């Protein structure tokens, strides 16, 4: 048995239906972000930077791209003989098997994997949020409070609090009540879906919950309320940095645009907290003689002959002469012809946009899926 103080379990099986065609053939955590990343890179990098070297990634919906991206974990220094990263899909057991039926059930189905490391603590994470957090500081808080379960929270506008699970706390941050999406929230401390549990206690509750036919097998709906009802010590750990749930087209687009703000607290350029990813070998970016690039992220392999403003371009995007790209996210290997206008769009990978086309407007966000071909002189405005 390999003893680990704490290991991380990343919930990465979400379908992300609100991202529409962007997750048609792709799990939400594997959606491209920020020119060179995938969403899950932030959670994996947080683990690596926090000194966590044993991670289980729980996959389910369309896992192929995600599995290939993570591989053996080399970009995050997780290619290890003792620990490292393990992909954990639903599987058949002697007593049967099923899809993960909820967040808690996903952990329950992997009790044997966790017990192999005999951890004191288990860190449960979502693989589909954009943020940077030092989990070691959260663990220190957990220990200092002698907590049985610690939940990371972030202050949200009170008018939006009804969209979240809300933690009602005493002055010492001890949670006395949890409300799942309350109609009239008492405060604005929203759960971030980041939990640290004492493993022996959580294991007991997971086993009990698995036997309840009327349970949703969910941390927010079942496990957290049960712990509170049983008198265990639960504390809220406040997080003050940038955090974005990119579960909608609007939030994904906005999070990409946030990277263009020099005052953005996410700061992907911080050398002390790098965001790691798989980095394909591409040639340098080429900027044509009449090209203009303003306030944009344009990465390796791109060839720009037109005008780029307030946009994010992934590898190997080609932009023809006299074309204008504004307020848009252009994913990898997109070929854009001449005299094309693209405004406030998300364009999926491997798409071809032929000459003289107009896509998007300045109001709503227009989304074009992967591998589409937009013919010459097309006009698409949602």
UniProtKB/Swiss-Prot annotation:
Alpha-D-glucose 1-phosphate binds at residues 100, 165, 180-181, 191. One of its GO terms (molecular function) is ATP binding. Gene3D superfamilies: Hexapeptide repeat proteins, Spore Coat Polysaccharide Biosynthesis Protein SpsA, Chain A. The keyword RNA-binding does not apply. Keywords: ATP-binding, Carbohydrate metabolism, Glycogen biosynthesis, Glycogen metabolism, Nucleotide-binding, Nucleotidyltransferase, Transferase. Its EC number is 2.7.7.27. One of its GO terms (biological process) is glycogen biosynthetic process. Pathway: Glycan biosynthesis; glycogen biosynthesis. It catalyses: alpha-D-glucose 1-phosphate + ATP + H(+) = ADP-alpha-D-glucose + diphosphate. CDD domains: ADP_Glucose_PP, LbH_G1P_AT_C. PROSITE patterns: ADP_GLC_PYROPHOSPH_1 (PS00808), ADP_GLC_PYROPHOSPH_2 (PS00809), ADP_GLC_PYROPHOSPH_3 (PS00810). HAMAP family: GlgC. Homotetramer. Involved in the biosynthesis of ADP-glucose, a building block required for the elongation reactions to produce glycogen. Catalyzes the reaction between ATP and alpha-D-glucose 1-phosphate (G1P) to produce pyrophosphate and ADP-Glc. Belongs to the bacterial/plant glucose-1-phosphate adenylyltransferase family. This is Glucose-1-phosphate adenylyltransferase. It comes from Clostridium novyi (strain NT).
